[in-house]
Structures are given as C-alpha cells and as structure tokens.
C-alpha cells in the first residue's frame, strides 16, 4: 500500500514538473519576440529643400536610410514629407543613382482628398542615355505639360534595391532632389532648387 502511494506521489510530482516546464517554455516563446529598431541601418542622412529661388511654397524634408551588412549596400529608403504650392507644376523630384532601381513606393500625397488617388500624382521616368547623371527619376506632383497639379501635402516613401547582388564599400553614391518651377523670359524650368544627398558605407551613421 505504501509503495502504491509513493508511486502515485512520484507520478503526480513528475506531472507537476512537466506542466510547470511547459508553461515556462510557453511564456518564454511569447515574450521572446522583441521589436528591432534600425535593423541593419548603417547610415542616416537628413535633407531639407525649399523652392527659395521662386515665389512658390514648395518644399520637401526627410531622411534617407541606408541598410547594409558585411560592407555591402542592401537597401535604401527615402522618407520625405512633401508640400507643393497650388501654382507649381514642377513639384518634387528624386533622382536615383545608376545601378539602383525602385522596388516600391508608398504615398499619402493628395490622399486626404477622397476624390483623388495618390498614385496618380507619382510618375517614374527612366533614361537609357550613357551620359546621363541619373538613370531613374521619381516625380511627385509634376506636370510635364506645365499645368499646375493643384498642390497639396503628404508623405512619400521610396524603397530602392541594387541591380547587382552587392555594392562595394568603396563606392559613394548620391540621391538627387529638386523642387519648384518657374517661367522666365519665355522659358519654363523645372527643378529650380536642388540638392544632393551623399551616401557612403565608409562614413557610417
């Protein structure tokens, strides 16, 4: 009889230990998920550009995030707040360096108006010219027929990936940005004000 009670007690103890172990492992699995902040971000560059050379109130500001690992460029993300003057037909343009391609674009520009579609105000242009400084252009709120698009505000996120599997650390690249438009002496001009945002893995954050 004593042997039977002892066996029952041991089995109950083992069962309790098993239940406690399972509950502990379950708790560990649910609490082990932690958010990653700036994973693989090796460089951040801020920018701010206004159409100061004109009477227009067009501007953009934001940051460029460079992701990389083992001395290679892996992804570039441009996050820009945009404001375009109602009378501006030049809008905002981002010039993408050679050997990079646009993988996705997310935009809220003009999205606060129910009758408008954000993607209608974004266009991507490419050039095959060998002497061109830039191969791809992402234009926001720009009308090449010189008609103002109505202006507006919003946020645009542009994701870039390299055409090649890896990019050398010795290679420095730049993102070109321009804003505004004007007509002077009968000539129309897009991109009245511009900057370049230099990027290099060597420089770090």
Regions from the PLM with identified roles:
Residues 16-26:
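Hydrophobic alpha-helical membrane-insertion segments, chiefly the h-region
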Residues 1-15:
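N-terminal Sec-pathway targeting helices
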Residues 79-83, 93, 161:
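Short edge beta-strand/loop segments characteristic of extracellular beta-sandwich folds
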Residues 87-99:
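Surface-exposed beta-strand/loop patches in extracellular or lumenal glycoproteins
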Residues 25, 31-55, 167, 178-205:
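Extracellular/luminal low-complexity Ser/Thr/Pro-rich, glycosylation-prone repeat/linker regions
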Residues 67-88:
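Short beta-strand elements of extracellular/lumenal beta-sandwich folds
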Residues 133-172, 180-184:
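Low-complexity, intrinsically disordered segments enriched in Ser/Thr together with acidic residues
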């Amino acid at each position: 009889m004593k042997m039977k009670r002892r066996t029952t007690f041991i089995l109950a103890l083992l069962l309790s230990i098993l239940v406690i172990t399972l509950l502990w492992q379950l708790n560990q699995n649910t609490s082990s998920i932690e958010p990653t902040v700036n994973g693989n971000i090796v460089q951040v560059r801020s920018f701010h550009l206004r159409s100061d050379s004109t009477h227009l109130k067009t501007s953009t500001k934001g940051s460029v995030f460079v992701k990389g690992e083992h001395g290679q460029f892996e992804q570039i993300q441009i996050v820009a707040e945009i404001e375009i003057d109602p009378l501006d037909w030049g809008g905002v343009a981002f010039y993408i360096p050679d050997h990079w391609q646009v993988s996705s674009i997310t935009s809220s520009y003009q999205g606060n108006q129910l009758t408008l579609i954000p993607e209608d105000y974004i266009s991507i242009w490419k050039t095959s010219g060998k002497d061109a400084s830039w191969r791809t252009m992402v234009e926001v709120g720009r009308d090449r027929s010189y008609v103002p698009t109505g202006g507006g505000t919003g946020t645009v996120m542009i994701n870039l990936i390299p055409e090649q599997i890896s990019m050398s650390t010795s290679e420095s690249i730049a993102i070109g940005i321009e804003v505004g438009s004007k007509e002077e002496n009968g000539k129309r001009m897009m991109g009245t004000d511009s900057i370049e945002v230099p990027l290099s893995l060597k420089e770090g954050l």
